[in-house]
From Swiss-Prot:
SMART domains noted in UniProt: RRM
SUPFAM superfamilies with a match to the protein in the record: RNA-binding domain, RBD
Lineage start: Eukaryota, Viridiplantae, Streptophyta, Embryophyta, Tracheophyta
One Pfam family cited in the UniProt record for this chain: RRM_1
Residues carrying Phosphoserine: 184
InterPro entries documented for this protein: Nucleotide-bd_a/b_plait_sf (IPR012677), RBD_domain_sf (IPR035979), RBM (IPR050441), RRM_dom (IPR000504)
Positions with biased composition (Basic residues): 149-176
The protein's assembly and partners: Component of the spliceosome. Interacts with RS2Z33, CYP59, CYP63 and CYP95.
Protein name: Serine/arginine-rich SC35-like splicing factor SCL28
Main subcellular location of this protein, as a coarse class: nucleus
Native organism: Arabidopsis thaliana
Localization in the cell: Nucleus speckle
BP term (GO), one: mRNA splicing, via spliceosome
Amino acid sequence: MARARSRSRSYSPRPRDRSPPRERKGYDDNRLRERPSSRDHESSGPSGLLIRNLPLDARPNDLRDSFERFGPLKDIYLPRNYYTGEPRGFGFVKYRYAEDAAEAMKRMNHKVIGGREIAIVFAEENRKTPQEMRTTNGTSGRHGDYKRTSHRSPRRRYRSHSRSRSPPRRESRHSKVREDDLYSPRRRSRSISRSPLPRNEREYKSRNCRSPREERVLTPIRSRCLSRSRSRSLSR
């Protein structure tokens, strides 16, 4: 009897699970069947989308309902102003596979969401941190705009580097020497000697002709002196 009972227990049918089957998400099954091997690993193409001209009251669930049908999503992000908390009118959708992102951009570009026509482009892979968003939304200028300061700093370094290697100007060197010579006693004496003589001194020298240097250089004056001396001797 024990054996019969054990056999009856072993052959008793197990109750089946009558729970309803899980609903499958509305992915494009045809694309999944066509590329089973290529979707096993994540592709290297861009998988993030930047969605512009979104309504200000848009929520992540609104984008999920519109974009999740093209493939599994990794993230949905709607940036807001750091200080006011107001939405900025654009958002990011991150797919798991690059093929899904390309398909979503192809089909959803220029579609209407919330009464606005959206524009979709591929987004950069690196999302900004809250600190970067605070810097962008905050005061701009020397401390706020990091890109502007980093863009200007190499130009300043290049200018200073080129100035350090540039040869000194010759004009400044000669002008400095001339100024020093002008205030030196030797230069002062030369300038005095070369200055035009007063009228009385010229008449005196022309009459007496005592300067041998002027006799050698100024031949017309010497001839005049000789003629005047001869006229004086004859008159006497």
